[in-house]
Amino acid sequence: MSQIKKVVLAYSGGLDTSIIAKWLQEEYQCEVVTFTADIGQGEEVAPARAKAEAMGIKEIYIEDLREEFARDFVFPMMRANAIYEGEYRLGTSIARPLISKRLVEIAQETGADAISHGATGKGNDQVRFELNAYALMPDVKVIAPWREWDLLSREKLMAYAEEHNIAIEKKKGKKSPYSMDANLLHISYEGGIIEDPANEPEEDMWLWSVSPENAPDQPTYIDISYEKGDIVAINGEAMSPATVMEYLNKVGGENGIGRDDIVENRFVGMKARGCYETPAGTIMLKAHRAIESLTLDRNAAHLKDELMPKYAEMIYNGFWFSPEREMLQALIDQSQDYVSGDVRLKLYKGNVIVVGRTSENSLFDEDIATFEDDGGAYNHKDAEGFIKLNALRLRTAAKKRR
């Protein structure tokens, strides 16, 4: 332990990571550098500075990474229509590569020997943080206190905090029984009564959205503009990636959009139940598929759909910086060259309904697709040979097996 002289800690300013900071100082007798990222979690990050200073920490990094998170991580993922196991929109998974990236960069800037995080030994986050870190800094030393210490209960953590004069916030009102994680893309809930998959979540658990039953009785219409697969404007107003997500979270939440209750298969081998609110992500996925339906070639679209589950699994498992994810990303990005245009959506009581889409790159030819007289644009007789050729193997097999 004495070989470690300086550690960069992913620091939220909360009780757990404050305890980790003090534990690192005591157990490793090392200097601690804290890194706090604002990725849209909706909490004030500035108090993290005072808390770190109270523990004698000198090098403190507090950074607003919302635009980088949206632009370089969420938007590329949205081009792929990525969703894990058909339901999970990867809100936590996609945030970890950026945090790992900055941890490694700060370690290199400060000459640190190691990085540290507060992920537990049961979850996926320990894997994500560390795989992403090793991909960027192969020889980095990672300290994961939850895999080393014996502070394995809330009571032991509280006792440690009191013994070492670590401030314990006493929030007014009812304390949430859930473990929560939030960023621009989502907020997640685990623990409490929802550890039992049979229990319906209580309504007051949800923080970002009204229930669909209590959403407005009148629909909200929005127009989303795309350029090469990315949203560039809403209702005619140009917006940055982070601003897009903030707006869609607000309008989506107001209309009861984005609630998911999932039992997912964790990479570490267990099943876990989580509840998620992903208003912006839900709207973005629906709108992106709508503009692709107009502009992507059929076989290109089908190939993307075949590759998407693997791409989503890479992100979920922590392989954002892997060669296979980067290879797939290049293919996905190339597919978006003509994915530009506008999508009109109706938001109503938890539903995202596509009501219109237009594009100068549209592959929809009304002259061919019409049910009216097409003036010879499509020769119906061509279908006969097409059908017979496709039926050839079926007819041959049927004759042989009689």
Curated annotation (Swiss-Prot):
| Entry's EC annotation | 6.3.4.5
Q: Which keywords, in A-to-Z order, does the entry hold?
A: Amino-acid biosynthesis, Arginine biosynthesis, ATP-binding, Cytoplasm, Ligase, Nucleotide-binding
Catalyses: L-citrulline + L-aspartate + ATP = 2-(N(omega)-L-arginino)succinate + AMP + diphosphate + H(+)
**Classification via Pfam families:** Arginosuc_syn_C, Arginosuc_synth
Question: Where in the cell does this protein reside?
Answer: Cytoplasm
Listed GO biological process terms: argininosuccinate metabolic process; L-arginine biosynthetic process; urea cycle
Q: What InterPro entries does its record include? A: Arginosuc_syn_C, Arginosuc_syn_N, Arginosuc_synth, Arginosuc_synth_CS, Arginosuc_synth_type_1_subfam, AS_cat/multimer_dom_body, Rossmann-like_a/b/a_fold
User: Which pathway is this protein engaged in?
Assistant: Amino-acid biosynthesis; L-arginine biosynthesis; L-arginine from L-ornithine and carbamoyl phosphate: step 2/3
CDD domains referenced in this protein's UniProt entry, alphabetically: ASS
Q: Summarize where ATP binds, as residue positions.
A: A10, Y11, S12, G13, G14, L15, D16, T17, S18, A37, G118
UniProt binding sites for L-aspartate: T120, N124, D125
Q: Which domain of life is it from?
A: Bacteria
| Chloroplast among keywords | no
HAMAP family recorded for this chain?
Answer: Arg_succ_synth_type1 (MF_00005)
Record's protein name: Argininosuccinate synthase
Its lineage opens with:
Bacteria, Pseudomonadati, Pseudomonadota, Gammaproteobacteria, Thiotrichales
Per the record, the gene is argG
